[in-house]
């Protein structure tokens, strides 16, 4: 009695039709007619690696030791398997681990490492770490592959791929970074949790719409450079939490289920990318993988398992299916960047540091000082990148925020930012560099703006008169640039400003300004200043407040409602603007977009540009809804209305990794340009 799992010899691959299976239990017999259909002999190419969270599962210092040990263990595994003729391939998804290893390795270890890379037994991803591309400036993404270029030059090796693990989605600039740096292959292994509605934690449509999809990405259809992008259909974590004594049974079950899925969805290829991380994040090397694969292939005619190299896998796929691979452009708009705004003050600082470093680097090259300080720039780049690495804190950061394991991880995370500040200040002094923001509005002989008016019951702008027309939308409940505080998740409670007082106002021939103080839940000492310089078409908002710390779920937003509903939305920077939703690839985030520089709303008569240099995220159509379904947020699949927009200032909505509460002083500006 009870549940029994029985394996028996199957049928030859060529056998088709039906058969009857008879099961005898005591004196009873049960019969089941089984249809036998043609199936492909799938080749599952195992890409074995350890997902490198710099923190989360362990303190960052312990992760460094774990990943160094993994490299040493993998070198031993490769050496031992060569002796018995079994294939061993180990992938390193984050070169942070390689830099740590090489810093302390002896010469024989370094030689063994380089030889393993050249032989294809060690496969390096070009990424220094798994970063959130939606937080990063275009030039900053170059720093992500900077160490890979150093390794190539120093050891005469070639790094041909990038592996992004856990993170769902990648920006257009993130994709272009690889083509610009001549990296031909991108393996995406997003977060995967079978029993969640989207089959992953806050992954939106990435798994369901983009899993097992292969395409060439180009910056534009006519571009010559291309990137082969392949999302592993079961992410990177399909084999987590499997003990060695249950490996055979659970792999058989999960591979079988995967084959059925591939058949039912009419997967057009017979080659499958299968990411494999053992046990959990920052897991070990499976030194018995070769024996397991050999035993599997001796036991089963189909499917075949292969211990593979991601570079040779992608090359094999191109060779076999190259003429069938579609060419796409755009981005897989990402999802996890919202968590960074659980530490909004620090993220604003790192974003500013990135922008300032980009300008300082241009200055150093212009003044012929780059070569002298290139190592200092590398150290600065490294810390900015590490703050944008996707691991913000511990796995129990929300459930146990006061635990030393949690607070120490945040201390170390913040130390990357603190170190970057020190390095920037020291380097700018040596270079004689003073940063000047590029935020000056274009002057005009006569502004198309004739007036703006503030609503003293909301603190927002009620009217902006442009060529005798009011551009502020009145059907939306919020005024233009109004601050909105949201408490809770389901249902959300929205709070608006109150006790608004005028601190200063001016309306002269040169400018109109009004400075307000106000009260808003969750903050104190809030002041807002609106400014229109009358020989420009820009209205600026300068905000300052002190955030009060709370563990209750919360968020803050700035509203941008406009008249009419026919606005077209574009976002990006001066090099590239994307159209929402036309330039979003399948699986993209439709609820908020990641913006490097500005958003633009256009219709037949107007163009409105919004710049918020301190922030990355804009919610489209509505303030984000964090209602849970079976304990998880389910993301909208349909495009949202492009009006209104909301600048997403802060939140603590995550259930893990990011911070449970935040405080600190906020000071920032938002620029609204009208044409």
Language model segments and positions:
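Short, surface-exposed connector motifs at secondary-structure boundaries
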Residues: 154-161, 270-274, 538-540
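C-terminal (or distal) subdomains of carbohydrate-active enzymes
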Residues: 174-179, 191, 211-213, 240, ...
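Short, solvent-exposed turn/loop segments enriched in Gly/Ser/Thr/Pro and often Arg
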Residues: 88-98, 127-130, 162-171, 189-195, ...
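Active-site and substrate-binding clefts of carbohydrate-active enzymes
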Residues: 43-45, 50-53, 203-436, 571-675
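Catalytic alpha-helical scaffold of carbohydrate-active enzymes acting on polysaccharides/glycoconjugates
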Residues: 40-49, 69-85, 100-160, 170-180, ...
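An acidic-aromatic substrate-binding cleft motif
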Residues: 29-67, 77, 88
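Extended acidic/polar, glycine-enriched regions
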Residues: 1-44
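Active-site cores of enzymes that catalyze phosphoryl transfer or operate on phosphate-rich substrates
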Residues: 80-85, 89-94, 101-124, 209-256, ...
């Amino acid at each position: 009695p009870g549940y029994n799992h029985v394996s028996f010899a199957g049928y030859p691959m060529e056998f088709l039709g039906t058969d009857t299976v008879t099961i005898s239990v005591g004196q009873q017999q049960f019969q089941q007619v089984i249809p036998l259909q043609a199936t492909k002999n799938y080749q599952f190419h195992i890409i074995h690696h350890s997902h490198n969270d710099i923190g989360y599962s362990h303190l960052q210092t312990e992760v460094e030791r774990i990943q160094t040990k993994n490299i040493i263990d993998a070198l031993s595994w490769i050496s031992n398997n060569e002796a018995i003729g079994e294939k061993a391939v180990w992938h390193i998804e984050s070169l942070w681990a390689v830099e740590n290893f090489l810093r302390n390795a002896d010469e024989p270890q370094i030689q063994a490492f380089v030889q393993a890379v050249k032989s294809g037994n060690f496969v390096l991803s070009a990424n220094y770490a798994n970063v959130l591309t939606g937080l990063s400036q275009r030039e900053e993404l170059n720093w992500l592959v900077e160490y890979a270029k150093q390794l190539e030059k120093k050891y005469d090796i070639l790094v041909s791929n990038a592996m992004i693990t856990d993170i769902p989605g990648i920006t257009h600039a993130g994709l272009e970074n690889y083509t610009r740096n001549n990296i031909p292959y991108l393996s995406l292994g997003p977060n995967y949790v079978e029993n969640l509605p989207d089959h992953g934690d806050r992954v939106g449509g990435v798994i369901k719409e983009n899993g097992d999809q292969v395409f060439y990405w180009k910056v534009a259809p006519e571009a010559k450079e291309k990137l082969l992008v392949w999302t592993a259909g079961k992410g990177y974590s399909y084999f987590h939490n499997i003990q060695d004594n249950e490996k055979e049974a659970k792999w058989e079950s999960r591979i079988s289920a995967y084959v059925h899925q591939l058949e039912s969805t009419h997967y057009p290829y017979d080659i499958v990318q299968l990411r494999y991380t053992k046990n959990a994040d920052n897991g070990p090397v499976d030194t018995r993988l070769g024996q397991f694969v050999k035993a599997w292939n001796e036991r089963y005619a189909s499917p075949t398992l292969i211990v593979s190299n991601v570079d040779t896998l992608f090359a094999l796929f191109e060779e076999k299916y190259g003429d069938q691979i579609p060419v796409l452009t755009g981005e897989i708009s990402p999802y996890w960047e919202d968590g960074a705004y659980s530490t909004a003050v620090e993220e604003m600082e790192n974003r500013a540091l990135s922008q300032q470093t980009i300008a300082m680097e241009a200055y150093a090259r212009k003044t012929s000082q780059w070569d002298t300080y290139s190592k200092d720039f590398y150290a600065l780049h490294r810390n900015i990148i590490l703050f944008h690495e996707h691991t913000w804190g511990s796995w129990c950061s929300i459930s146990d925020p006061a635990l030393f394991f949690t607070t120490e991880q945040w201390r170390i995370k913040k130390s990357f930012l603190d170190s970057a500040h020190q390095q920037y200040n020291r380097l700018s002094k040596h270079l004689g560099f003073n940063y000047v923001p590029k935020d000056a509005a274009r002057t005009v002989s006569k502004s198309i703006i004739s007036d703006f008016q503030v609503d003293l019951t909301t603190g927002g702008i009620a009217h902006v008169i442009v060529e005798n027309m009011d551009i502020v939308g009145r059907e939306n409940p919020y005024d233009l640039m109004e601050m909105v505080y949201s408490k809770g998740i389901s249902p959300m409670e929205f709070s608006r400003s109150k006790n608004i007082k005028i601190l200063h106002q001016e309306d002269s021939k040169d400018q109109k300004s009004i400075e307000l103080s106000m009260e808003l839940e969750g903050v104190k000492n809030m002041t807002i200043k609106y400014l229109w310089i009358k020989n420009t078409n820009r209205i600026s908002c300068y905000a300052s407040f002190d955030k009060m710390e709370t563990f209750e779920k919360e968020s803050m937003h700035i509203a941008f409602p406009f008249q009419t509903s026919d606005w077209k939305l574009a976002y990006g920077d001066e090099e590239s603007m994307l159209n929402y939703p036309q330039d979003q690839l399948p699986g993209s985030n439709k609820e908020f977009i990641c913006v490097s520089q500005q958003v633009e709303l256009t219709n037949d008569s107007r163009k409105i540009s919004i710049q918020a240099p301190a922030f990355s995220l804009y919610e489209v159509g509505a303030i984000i809804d964090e209602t849970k379904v079976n304990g998880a947020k389910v993301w909208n699949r349909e495009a949202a209305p492009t009006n209104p927009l909301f600048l997403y200032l802060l939140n603590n909505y995550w259930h893990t990794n990011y911070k449970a509460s935040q405080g600190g002083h906020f000071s920032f500006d938002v620029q609204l340009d009208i044409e």
